[in-house]
Amino acid sequence: GTRIKGVDVPTTLTTPEAPTLQALFARMAREGVTHVVMEVSSHALMLGRVGGTLFDAAGFTNLSQDHLDFHPTMEDYFEAKALFFDPASPLHAEHSVICVDDEWGERMARVARNPVTVGTRGQAGVDVAATQLGADDSGAQEVELVLGDATYEFTLPLPGAFNVANAALAVALAAEVGVDPEAFISGLSEASVPGRMQRIDRGQDFV
């Protein structure tokens, strides 16, 4: 779905078809929206849904076997995603932020031009490093994030190591487009994704 200034707008695809997407952008502009955050699927990149849309920054989290019904191989899937990061592609974003926690991320960082790199596994040389310091019974995690010369500690209510990587990437993307990291991080304490790793508590003695 889509949300514009707190109002839910029903949409069905991860990335809407081009006419719908541009209509949404036009509505946002009329309503005074200045920034858009969206998920761009490999389908959208391959099928022209974001053609003519200029992106300030793009983030790459990871690559897994999610869409092999559409892509015949992982290599084809990677090449589709690379359209968003390769400076030779007409679809590439102005800035790239890439999580290098796996081989696909490391490879994408080599494709992109001057990417900001994010790591959660203690890698040397990354631009943004995140570490889980601990977690409570609800799954909420204490996270330390090093960005440039600054170190931040915050509570992330979303469980799972992948959400530490997602949060670090989001902070790095926000910083790349001029958002104050401290202000952005303060909002992570209220982050939730309904239906995704959502805790259900009905009084049971298990999570």
What kind of region is each of these model predictions?
Residues A44-G51:
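Conserved helix/coil segment N-terminal to the catalytic DExD/H
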Residues V9-S41:
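Conserved nucleotide-sensing/catalytic segment adjacent to the nucleotide-binding pocket
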